[in-house]
């Protein structure tokens, strides 16, 4: 896997939910995409918007040299992306980041996959690859409300799936931490835990599995360069009494073991 840059072609784009879009891209760069949990850095085709936007990879299709991204419109850059049509091109840098480690689980073992909001997309490729290994996946997905929920059927097709919404309009009332607590209370202990979402959700997972050796968290930090040069996305390491040791989320991450970093 190498980091490369390419003008990739938009194959299709559609809206999944309010402010949530699915973007399919085609190009040679897909050959370099292998590990779930990686992301790409996209140049906004507007002269006044200089910083690239990091967007996680939702699906990889090597046979058609396509990849799928799912993003939420948050500002001027993603607003531009949402207006683009099939046939147009985007300047893509990637794949970036380390990706999830799926070597620690084997066929017949169980993995909890936990996602919240816009942290859900990269977990689909992860679940797909774990399925291919024969790992039993159990999904715990949280949304703000039924209105903004997406990709439910896709995850359900891969394995057991539990949903929660903040307002109780779909699935359990509350957050995914409640779903995890209920699963643990029933004696369901996973061989590995993979999660991506807001910092509060990741902290809850860290507290639920304080000594588990295989809890992997994908951190959502603001990024600028995406290649570890600017130090805009650092987080501190656990066990560092000086507070001076840090890791770069874009380059050394975005995935870390829960035992490694301070959330």
Curated annotation (Swiss-Prot):
Which InterPro entries does its entry note?
Answer: Cbr1-like_FAD-bd_dom, Cyt_c3_hydrogenase_gsu, Dihydroorotate_DH_ele_sf, Dihydroorotate_DH_Fe-S-bd, Dihydroorotate_DHASE_ETsu, FAD-bd_FR_type, FNR_nucleotide-bd, PyrK_electron_transfer
State the Pfam families in the record: DHODB_Fe-S_bind, FAD_binding_6
Pathway annotation:
Pyrimidine metabolism; UMP biosynthesis via de novo pathway; orotate from (S)-dihydroorotate (NAD(+) route): step 1/1
Q: Name one GO molecular function term.
A: electron transfer activity
Gene Ontology BP annotations: 'de novo' UMP biosynthetic process
**Could you say which residues bind FAD here?**
53-56, 70-72, 77-78
Positions that bind [2Fe-2S] cluster: 225, 230, 233, 250
Cofactors needed by this protein, per the record, are: [2Fe-2S] cluster; FAD
**Cofactor detail note:** Binds 1 [2Fe-2S] cluster per subunit. Binds 1 FAD per subunit.
Q: Locate the FAD-binding FR-type domain: which residues? A: 3-102
Taxonomic superkingdom: Bacteria
Provide this UniProt record's keywords sorted from A to Z. Answer: 2Fe-2S, Electron transport, FAD, Flavoprotein, Iron, Iron-sulfur, Metal-binding, Pyrimidine biosynthesis, Transport
Cited NCBIfam families: PRK00054.1-2, PRK00054.1-4
Entry similarity comment: Belongs to the PyrK family.
Q: How does it assemble?
A: Heterotetramer of 2 PyrK and 2 PyrD type B subunits.
Which purpose does this protein serve, as stated in its record? Answer: Responsible for channeling the electrons from the oxidation of dihydroorotate from the FMN redox center in the PyrD type B subunit to the ultimate electron acceptor NAD(+).
Please name the PANTHER family in this protein's record: DIHYDROOROTATE DEHYDROGENASE B (NAD(+)), ELECTRON TRANSFER SUBUNIT, DIHYDROOROTATE DEHYDROGENASE B (NAD(+)), ELECTRON TRANSFER SUBUNIT-RELATED
State the name under which the record lists this protein.
Dihydroorotate dehydrogenase B (NAD(+)), electron transfer subunit
Starting at the broadest rank, the lineage of the source organism is: Bacteria, Bacillati, Bacillota, Bacilli, Lactobacillales
Q: Which gene encodes it?
A: pyrK
């Amino acid at each position: 896997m190498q980091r490369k840059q390419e003008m990739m072609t938009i194959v299709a784009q559609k809206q999944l939910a309010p402010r949530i879009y699915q973007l399919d891209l085609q190009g040679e760069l897909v050959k370099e995409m292998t590990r779930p949990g990686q992301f790409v850095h996209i140049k906004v085709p507007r002269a006044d918007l200089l910083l690239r936007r990091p967007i996680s990879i939702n699906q990889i299709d090597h046979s058609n040299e396509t990849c799928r991204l799912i993003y939420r419109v948050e500002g001027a850059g993603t607003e531009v992306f949402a207006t683009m049509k099939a046939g147009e091109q985007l300047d893509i840098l990637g794949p970036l980041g380390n990706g999830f480690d799926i070597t620690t689980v084997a066929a017949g073992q169980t993995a909890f996959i936990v996602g919240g909001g816009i942290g859900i997309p990269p977990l689909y490729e992860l679940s797909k690859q774990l399925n291919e290994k024969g790992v039993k996946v159990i999904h715990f997905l949280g949304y703000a409300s039924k209105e903004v929920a997406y990709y439910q059927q896709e995850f359900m097709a891969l394995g057991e799936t539990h949903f929660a919404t903040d307002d109780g309009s779909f699935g359990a009332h509350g957050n995914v931490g409640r779903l995890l607590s209920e699963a643990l209370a029933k004696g369901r202990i996973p061989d590995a835990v993979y999660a991506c979402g807001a910092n509060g959700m990741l902290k809850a997972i860290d507290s639920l599995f304080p000594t588990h050796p295989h809890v992997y968290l994908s951190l959502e930090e603001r990024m600028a360069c995406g290649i570890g040069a600017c130090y805009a996305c650092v987080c501190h390491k656990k066990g560092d009494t000086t507070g001076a040791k840090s890791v770069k989320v874009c380059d050394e991450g975005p995935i870390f073991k829960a035992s490694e970093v301070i959330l």
